[in-house]
Amino acid sequence: MDCETRGRGRRGRGNRNEESRDVRLSKSLSYVLRHGASKMGLQMNSDGFVFVEELLAHQQFRSFSVDDVERVVASNDKQRFKLCKHPEDDRLQIRANQGHSVQVTDLELREISQDDQDYPREAVHGSYMKHWPSIRSQGLSRMNRTHIHLAPGLPGEGRVISGMRQSCDLAVYIDVTKAMSDGIKFFWSENGVLLTPGDAAGILAPCYFSRAQRLKPLPCDIELH
């Protein structure tokens, strides 16, 4: 089986207990594969993959099966995970597509060039109005992660599937072309999230903000300065 991202489609009708288990498994997978593998004694390869058999042998995952993992990966509408067989020994392995706080040197990211015809000239970062004063004055920070997450549009627009939470009530729009002209790098993740490490300090400065919107209760433009 070739490596492929399994995450299209929605979970069919199931009982609430199964749904709750799936949510719990999805959250646990996100933590382990993005942040906590080494803390839990699990070996993560340089490309971010962890072997499923080793994962399921861990105390936190012993109540789950390979079928559970496959179902959660397939039903994840944001395609957060990639599940495939290792090319050398066919052992099943899993990784998170983005969102890491641990350094993953061989993560499959595609760097964007201004020569690309399809790169988004403007991208959006989702946050919350309570953070707007600090964002407006200091910029966006990758904080403890390796990248700042952006989307090519708001959730539900076109083929936008990931990049910001549905609960966000603030949208900060980034002038991608201007930032790239100043040497800021941008990458596509496998599930369509636009990623940037920001500048040397991990910041995307306010000078790259093109506009901002309060999203709830109704979209409304807000002042940048």
Curated annotation (Swiss-Prot):
Keyword line: NAD, Transferase, tRNA processing
Residue ranges of the TM segments: none
Pfam families found in the cross-reference section: PTS_2-RNA
Q: Which reaction does it catalyse?
A: 2'-phospho-[ligated tRNA] + NAD(+) = mature tRNA + ADP-alpha-D-ribose 1'',2''-cyclic phosphate + nicotinamide
Any single biological process term in GO: tRNA splicing, via endonucleolytic cleavage and ligation
Q: Which top EC class is given?
A: transferase
**GO molecular function annotation:** tRNA 2'-phosphotransferase activity
Q: What is its EC number?
A: 2.7.1.160
Claim: Glycoprotein is one of the keywords in the record: no
Q: Does the keyword NAD apply?
A: yes
| Cross-referenced PANTHER family | PUTATIVE PHOSPHOTRANSFERASE, TRNA 2'-PHOSPHOTRANSFERASE 1
The similarity comment for this entry is: Belongs to the KptA/TPT1 family.
- In UniProt terms, what function does this protein have? Catalyzes the last step of tRNA splicing, the transfer of the splice junction 2'-phosphate from ligated tRNA to NAD to produce ADP-ribose 1''-2'' cyclic phosphate.
**Name listed for the protein in its UniProt record:** tRNA 2'-phosphotransferase 1
Naturally occurring in which organism (per UniProt): Danio rerio (Zebrafish)
